[in-house]
Amino acid sequence: MNIILSTFIFGMGDDFSIFIMEGLLYKYKTGKKLLDPHKTAIFFSAFTMIVGIGALVFARHPALHSIAIITILGMFAVVLVAYTAEPVIFNAFVTKPTSQGRPPFTLWAILRNIVFYIPPVLGSAFILLLSFVAMLVPAKKSSRQAAIGWMLHRACRILVGYAAFIHPKRIGPDGELIRSWNGEAGVIVANHQSSLDIIMILATFPKVKFMVADWVLTSPLFGVISRFLGYYSRSEGYEKSLERLRVDVADGWCLAVFPEGTRSLNGKIKRFHKGAFYLASQVGVPVIPVVFYGNWRIAPKNQGFNMTEGIAVTEVMAPVSTISAEYHELTVRISSLVKAEYAELCRKYDSPVNPYFRKALVSSYIYKGPVTEWYVKVKTKMEDSYSFFHSVLPREGRITDIGCGMGQMDFMLSMYCPERRIIGIDYDADKIAVAQNSWLLKNLPDLEFRCGNASECELPESNAFVISDMLHYLDPQAQEALIRRCAEKLLPGGMILVRDSDSENAKGQKVTALSEVFSTRILAFNRTQGELNFISHSRMETIASTVGLKMTVRSNDAVTSNTFYILKF
């Protein structure tokens, strides 16, 4: 009997945990509280069980007494676990990282990160052991340092190469990809984004020493290696560093310095301090500017274990001579060079070619329902991460997306170009709630979502309006009225980008109509208030002419009748 009762209590504990998880997930998805009512229901359920069966504790029969004890202890245990353990775990792996603007943890991400960190720890321990052995080898210290430095270089190259979620690109001064730096020695200055920067420098430069904080030299694992290799301390003073730097450069070593002094939280380059440039100018060695892109997204500051997939660029620029150069002027000039090149890398890789953006977008919809997650994965794949929208729409200015759904396109366009000020409008309050409770919004201050009917809500003045896959939900009169209202709010040089069907394409229209049947009637993913009204190319051209706009057309694909209608003054 006790076994049967224990099994029953265990089953109730499962139900309690499901209720708690449902409340946690609902708040994470929509921002609305459902947990408190669930907790109340759990309390009364447990209370009824304890009072009803737990009262048998006063019975004198040993079997009834035993049943009561098991009930009381069991119910207290399952309620305690449901009330405490589950919220704590959910907060640690979902709520906390997303509140800091990072994706939630998944089991795969945790295992992947563990696998990534095991080799560096074991490799560091092995190199630490070799450092002790090297101290006993009867050879020149510079030769022993070079051997250990070469091992670090090879180990970091292997580490970056086997980490499948890191897509490294090492670019030389001529713009070509390089395996490692084989140029002259000098002082390396680089923007500082992440702890990955150190690994990338070690993977690029075979002989390099770092300017580090004192705690690095005294740390238990890396301290011995750092001291053996002769890393520079910030507190040792310029004069001592100058003497050492002359010897090291003559021996082929580079000195790596991060002139910002700290890692950037958002990738933006801060003011360069002058110390590294003073050292280079005093010794007369060139400054080697290095530009990092993407590391802050893959392994951000204070979030090194919550890594994401993405492109990591290490660009080594042409060495800058310091002969007859004043270090103040040198600081300003190289800072401008690094910032300009970083901006160019952002223009190139803040785009659909970088897998980070799609991975980040999908991660913002996990734990929000399997249908939602599946839809976003499939939709972004079909849209090629919204590459066409990104290429056509302005890179800055106000963009209004009418019929934004859950906002996946708006998130992507905002991540590609933070200068875009985007407003997403949709009349489905549930979808807007999902969009408004995405962790991505914490990193995109110029993106907002509003719930409203496109036919009635006030439209803001915009540089571009996007009406994608929603025009056929309106009747013909409302379609023309909406485009007219957009044209009236269009700023000079602006555009209206419409994607909808071309009902004159008979073959493709059958596929488009069938897909709408699935989305509106079978899956009921999209809400509609009436019959669907698919627009034609000729009618769209008539509307554009009526509102005083010129229209160009581009087919969306070869299967459906979906067509891009680009309307401009």
Where are these regions (language model features)?
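Membrane-embedded transmembrane helical bundles of large multi-pass transporters/channels
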Residues: 1-111
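Catalytic core of membrane glycerolipid acyltransferases/transacylases, capturing the structured
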Residues: 131, 135-151, 182-237
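Conserved alpha-helix/loop element of class I SAM-dependent methyltransferases that forms part
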Residues: 379-395
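Non-catalytic C-terminal accessory region of glycerolipid acyltransferases
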Residues: 242-367
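A short glycine-rich, Lys/Arg-flanked "PGG" loop and its adjoining helix->strand segment in the class I
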Residues: 480-492
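C-terminal alpha-helical "lid/dimerization" subdomain adjacent to the S-adenosyl-L-methionine
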Residues: 499-544, 554-555
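A transmembrane-helix-recognition feature enriched in membrane-embedded lipid enzymes
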Residues: 106-167, 224-225, 371-374, 521
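Class I SAM-dependent methyltransferase SAM/SAH-binding core
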Residues: 408-446, 451-454
